[in-house]
Amino acid sequence: MDIVRNIKNTINMKVSNDYLGYSKFKKKITLEKRTEQSKIIMEKYPNRLPIICETSDKLPELDKHKYLIPEDLKSVSFMYIIRKRIKLKPEMAMYFFVNNKLLQANSEMSQIYHKYKDEDGFLYIYACSESTFG
């Protein structure tokens, strides 16, 4: 259990030093426009969740940051999608953070969305990575 706690502490420290709630998407687009975008998306696709996923400097840049995912999708499935998009090597571990909290792999995205969505209507997920084998 101590090993898990140490990993979480190390990752949390890395995220808070690296990220600190910074979002390129938020910086580029005003709150009003983001709110308008999420409302349009939610009206057009009521059973989908608008997600913004951004990566740390240690991961390759995503070709797109906006995702529209089914409500019943598990976070581990979304993580798999992101791993494939950035072509992450198997020996690299990837972690998702929402509001600087480590996301559990078996969580349902709808629960995460309703608990942590931003005031603009998007859920912001930050992906970071560490090498697990040296």
What do the predicted segments below correspond to?
Residues 1-134:
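Ubiquitin system architectures
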